[in-house]
Amino acid sequence: MKEFVISEAQVETAILVGLITQTQDERKTKEYLDELEFLAETAGATVVKRFTQKLPAANSVTYVGKGKLEEIKEYIHQEEENEREVGMVIFDDELSAKQIRNIEAELKVKILDRTSLILDIFAMRAQTANAKTQVELAQYKYMLPRLQRLWTHLERQGGGSGAGGGKGSVGFRGPGETQLEMDRRIILNRMSLLKERLAEIDKQKSTQRKNRGRMIRVALVGYTNVGKSTLMNLLSKSEVFAENKLFATLDTTVRKVIIENLPFLLTDTVGFIRKLPTDLVDSFKSTLDEVREADLLIHVVDISHPDFEEQISVVDKTIADLEAGGKPTMIVFNKVDAYTYVEKAEDDLTPKTRENITLEELMKTWMAKLNDNCIFISAREKINMDELKTIIYNKVRELHVQKYPYNDFLYQTYDEE
């Protein structure tokens, strides 16, 4: 069976669709759509239009209401008349098979949701056999309950009893149902094979981790695109792929780092994101085991991002879901060089908002909140890097003495360039 991981980024135009609900206000919806646009651009698409609608919850049939769907349809039609074809419509939440089928029937263009878009980017980014296997398994998990949509063209073959003796559902009797069941079996068999491969990879990686010697393991964690790989490069003096795109890192990279005369292992991990598909987290178990087995987590945060506090919450929740919560953790607020704020006029008596807070005020707030267990840096501009190394050195040394009290682990004094 041909492997499912094939994804070439081609420039296509896209429309984004999101909802404003009781639990997601207009500001948050805008931030989610900004992120969705960044995802679309990472996948190779150009966003030409956004549509939002206020609803108590997503419409179970078409996600948005009938009127909004008609509005989107009219926009696509107008673009076609102006010889500007819309390649796809991307929805900010995961769609059911029924929703995708109904929306496609109305809009007549490719329909994606946030999950399928993330999976596509992961497929594009996967380089090693391990990453490709993990992505392929996640893709099949996503595709399996949506198989029926892939066979809607068989509904036109008629409703005769066929070989199935009339036992299938309306529109899926006969050869359609047979093919659907065959495909389901093929995919289930393929998934079983992929799981066996990943189990073997898990075993190999577990052995590798045990053979790394008596050194403290430190893992860089954080939201996607916060600068983990750039920081990894600075600390390890190696060249880990770093790019201003989402999910630039899929495979974990482990490097031996020496600060002064203290060696330890540093791991760069895949970035987290809001609404990260559960199947993706499950499929990347072997990769995320590096987080579970770390002695110290360095949580990297992009402080210049307007919604960095929610990103912190997303990462904390994901770490808790991985059963890696409770580990010694320090927060590194990165990108201080990119932080901006709007100064209020002297006669403006309205309360300060997030955009009016200076970096100094923010630093004081978070240092008090975290009991000074944080530092503010710029990996790109190398601001406060010496201070960061000193903090890491002290934390790793303390952990090493606790974990390996009788191990003479210090190297001969190591002079950094």
Residue ranges of model-derived segments:
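Conserved catalytic network of the ASCE P-loop NTPase/AAA+ motor domain
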Residues: 8-9, 77-84, 256-260, 265, ...
